[in-house]
A protein has these predicted regions:
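Conserved, mostly hydrophobic/aromatic
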Residues: 116, 229, 287, 306, ...
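Active-site-proximal substrate-binding groove within the catalytic cores of carbohydrate-active enzymes
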Residues: 333-520, 526-541
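Alpha-helix-loop-beta-strand connector modules within alpha/beta enzyme cores
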Residues: 219-234, 327-344
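Beta-strand-rich recognition/accessory modules
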Residues: 37-150
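Aromatic-lined carbohydrate-binding/catalytic grooves of carbohydrate-active enzymes
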Residues: 154-289, 302
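Short acidic catalytic loops
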Residues: 1, 189-199, 238, 286-318, ...
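Short, small-residue-biased leader/transition segments that mark boundaries at the very start
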Residues: 2-9
Length: 545
């Protein structure tokens, strides 16, 4: 029998796996080949990405376990736009899996090839392993590292402070920024990213597009803030949503329609935004000039590039089909990024799409860091942290660490969320007392000690993938010498975690917090943990003989 799984994206609770038996999906392996009839089924089970948020419903990946052979198949479709994963019945009692980009049936995709022209579909990666989801996830992680653009950010795993989530929430001023920059430097962060709002004095949602500083927010200029970041030894970052212009943006209303995604003779509008069409070389040049200007004027070395609205099902302007316009847009966007990195090889670009709504390896082959969610609750964030290394490599998985209460276990839980991924620091740092700040500093310092092992290790999920109902969550990284394990107890005080090769374990210890503050032992091949309360988390180090 075969069990199929796919990754479901819920808004602000990304990376939640769903598991189905093949028979439940009406794809059973029974050979219906009676007298004079060669049996195969016509049923299929599909899931897909429908627009330009490639992962707003499902991630373009999946796992299939063959219980009869003990093999597991894992795959990903490397598309930033539309895609399709299809399971179906084949002859001889077999099942098939077909992976593709946009299709005519599901997406209305059509492309007319003229004589001498050729077409290549989006790439996909797949692996088959003996064993279950853990060796499969390890294999896909190694593959992702091989196909990714070599870059120093994913070698070093820089620690970034971002001023948005549970912090300034898009309302920056010079006064607010300077005090938070002090906190970021004190914590030991290496980059400081000024998020949304820096380009407009008021309600900015429908006015974005020119990316010029707001004088009301920064009376002495934005450069004063950037220079202060640099004076503290941090590198400067800015938020951009480069693929859009607001309907109230003065520049947008002076530009021709072919700069934008259009349908039925009009510009497509999504939530008071126009979508720039990167197939137009003038658009690409304008956006490149924006990036170069911000780098040259402010010393920016990091961009968080967001994508909060979509072009729906595409553009009918200068395209064989709306869906093909999406595909061509993304080909041009990927090339645009590659050209930027050729000229600015040390630049870091974070991939964001209202959190994880564009978390695909079309983008992540090129960009070094992924915003995994817009989730604002630290408890639900752990549900993402426990699973998301199945969707991205651990070092690319930007995980919010954003305490908003001055309480020790709250801070520890937040820090553990990020320790085996890429901790992405934010929160109400002005509320944190000395003890809470010290806990944050302790965690960031420890992360710098183990991040090379996070970079080289492979993920595993000793309890399987967590759900929103899980009382215990566990996620680990297995490195060459050591194994690290994050354990959360959102709904209980005791966790029982099976250990692989438990008889070979030489030592187990809690390494965050350093005082341990919990009980634990190895018993019957399990790590048994007694937490001091519900809603607690600890980071363990497991050393083998």
């Amino acid at each position: 029998g075969l069990v199929g799984s796919e990754m479901c994206i819920r808004d602000s609770c990304e990376a939640q796996w769903q598991k189905y038996d093949a028979e439940t999906l009406n794809l059973n392996g029974m050979v219906v080949d009676g007298f004079n009839h060669q049996g195969y089924g016509l049923n299929r089970y599909c899931y897909s990405g429908k627009g330009t948020w490639s992962t707003c419903e499902y991630l373009p990946m999946g796992i299939a376990e063959d219980r009869e052979t003990g093999e597991t198949y894992i795959f990903q479709i490397e598309s930033s736009g539309q895609w399709l994963a299809e399971y179906g019945s084949a002859q001889g009692g077999n099942l098939y899996l077909a992976l593709s980009g946009a299709t005519e049936q599901e997406h209305g995709w059509y492309k007319n090839l003229k004589p001498g022209e050729s077409f290549t579909t989006v790439p996909a990666g797949a692996a088959v392993v003996k064993g279950g989801p853990n060796p499969a996830a390890a294999a896909l992680t190694r593959y992702r590292r091989k196909v990714r653009r070599p870059n120093t950010d994913d070698e070093k795993l820089n620690v970034v402070f971002n001023d948005y989530m549970n912090c300034l929430m898009g309302d920056p001023t010079t006064e607010r920024e300077l005090s938070i920059i002090d906190k970021a430097a004190e914590l030991g962060c290496e980059y400081y990213c000024l998020d949304a709002g820096w380009y407009d004095d008021g309600f900015w949602w429908d006015r974005v597009g020119e990316w010029k500083e707001a004088s009301g927010r920064f009376p002495n200029g934005l450069k004063e803030v950037c220079d202060y970041v640099h004076s503290k030894g941090l590198k400067m970052g800015l938020w951009l949503e480069i693929e859009v212009m607001g309907v109230a943006c003065e520049l947008a209303n002076k530009l021709p329609d072919d700069w934008f995604v259009c349908r039925h003779g009009k510009r497509h509008i999504d939530n008071k935004r126009y979508m720039l069409d990167f197939r137009n070389p003038e658009v690409r040049k304008y956006c490149r000039d924006v990036v170069d200007r911000l780098i040259n004027d402010y010393g920016v070395e990091y961009f968080k590039v967001d994508y909060n609205v979509t072009m729906g099902y595409g553009s009918d302007l200068n395209s064989d089909s709306c869906a093909d316009a999406i595909r061509e847009h993304y080909e041009c966007l990927h090339q645009w990024y590659e050209e930027i990195f050729r000229d600015h090889p040390e630049l870091v670009v974070e991939n964001c799409g209202s959190g994880g709504q564009r978390m695909d390896y079309g983008m992540l082959k090129i960009l070094s860091l992924q915003s995994t969610s817009d989730q604002t609750d630290y408890l639900y964030n752990a549900n993402i942290a426990a699973n998301v290394a199945s969707a991205v490599t651990p070092e690319q998985g930007g995980m919010w660490v954003y305490p908003y209460e001055d309480e020790e276990e709250h801070v520890i839980y937040n820090v553990v969320n990020g320790m085996l991924l890429r901790p992405y620091i934010s929160g109400m740092v002005w509320k944190l007392g000395e003890n809470s700040m010290n806990r944050m500093k302790e965690g960031i310092s420890l992360y710098k000690e183990i991040r090379e092992e996070v970079r080289d290790g492979v993920p595993f999920f000793p309890l399987g993938f967590g759900t929103l109902k899980s009382e215990v969550l566990a996620y680990g990284v297995k490195a060459e010498k050591n194994t690290y394990l994050s354990v959360w107890t959102p709904g209980t005080t005791e966790a029982v975690i099976p250990l692989e090769n438990a008889e070979q374990v030489r030592r187990v210890s809690v390494i965050y917090p350093k005082e341990e503050m919990c009980g634990y032992k190895i018993e019957n091949g399990n790590l048994v943990v007694k937490m001091p309360q519900e809603k607690a988390a600890r980071l363990f180090k497991i050393e083998m003989k």
